[in-house]
């Protein structure tokens, strides 16, 4: 396969525009300028690398929700100045109500894929895993950060409430998944205004999500894991035939 063929296999069309960057006291690199700016804002205010990283993550949940979310999962490998290494496991897990027979493999799927009948493991409430990101981020901040949860969520809340410019990348991801996204009325209202994918350069305001972030900032991760947000999430899953319950 030609080396340059990676462009044809990318999730969105784009042109690389890279410029050298140097720093003497710190650097923040993410997939979106606003997320990088959020991290840099923490450093400029006297925060450390963990404060910057968590602020960047929360901001990415606003500006690149297709890639990062508080209901997603991930891991952190943190090396401290003393040379010690710490791993925080925030990976998503299968809901307790699922098992080996929950999904039926598609006999016509390509070899090596995990396609199932009806795409039930890929689309809709039945495809959702128990979230780990929020707890993982808050644990990293508690153990190794210096700022409060309210501090590191402030940039994300600002962009969600005031709005931000939609990137070509977000537009193309919405375009690619428009048929699936249209199945959810609230998602369609935000990302498919008038039935069409939200356009690059347009302003997207996610005020309800800003309120969710404010609640998280006030009450911490327990508001999701067993608290009010968790109950709301579990109720939505129950009404939508999903598998996640409050026990997850």
PLM feature segments, named:
Residues 1-37, 41, 49-248:
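Noncatalytic scaffold domains of N-terminal-nucleophile
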